[in-house]
């Protein structure tokens, strides 16, 4: 992949990177720093990408590591997903319900339903088994259903 094509590809994925960082980091500036660091590392390590088909997964993995680095440095727990993380036309309570999910369940749900990643891509990005991704998504969907139905009758 040429440098120009690589740059075009990562620029095209920048919005996705910001949305994924929303599911992990709380502070807007921390999210911006994590995405910036991700893009910088990706550029420096672009020659280590073995297969162009996995560029998106590779970038997400770098981003997740950067987000965890921010957590480690700030010792902060994720507590907020901005409204933009919810898909257009989504139930307004979805944002609040997503906030109630633990990060390990929330991240695969955001990657799959809001960013369109496959189970396999999520498993590669999070470095977990595809079965674990499915299990976390199943548990997350059940919890979301429970939370959203509770709000409906409140």
Feature roles, as predicted:
Residues 1-19, 23, 32, 106:
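A short, charge-rich alpha-helical start-of-domain segment used by transcription regulators
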Residues 14, 18, 39, 102, ...:
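C-terminal flanking helix
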Residues 19, 33-40, 44, 53-65:
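Structural recognition of an alpha-helix C-terminal capping motif at a helix-to-coil junction
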Residues 29, 120, 131:
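Residues within helix-turn-helix
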Residues 48-50, 61-80, 139:
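Arg/Lys-rich amphipathic alpha helix in sigma70-family domain 2
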Residues 69, 74-99, 118, 153-154:
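Internal acidic/polar
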């Amino acid at each position: 992949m040429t440098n120009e094509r690589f740059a075009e590809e990562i620029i095209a994925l920048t919005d996705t990177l910001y949305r994924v960082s929303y599911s992990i980091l709380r502070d807007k500036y921390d999210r911006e720093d994590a995405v910036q660091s991700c893009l910088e590392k990706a550029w420096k390590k672009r020659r280590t990408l073995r297969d162009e088909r996995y560029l998106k997964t590779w970038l997400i993995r770098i981003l997740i590591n950067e987000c965890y680095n921010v957590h480690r440095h700030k010792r902060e727990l994720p507590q907020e997903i901005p409204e933009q993380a919810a898909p257009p036309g989504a139930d307004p309570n979805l944002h609040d319900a997503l906030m109630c999910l633990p990060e390990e369940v929330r991240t695969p749900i955001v990657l799959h339903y809001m960013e369109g990643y496959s189970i396999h891509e999520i498993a590669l990005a999070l470095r977990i088994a595809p079965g674990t991704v499915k299990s976390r998504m199943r548990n997350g969907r059940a919890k979301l259903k429970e939370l959203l139905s509770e709000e409906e009758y409140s």
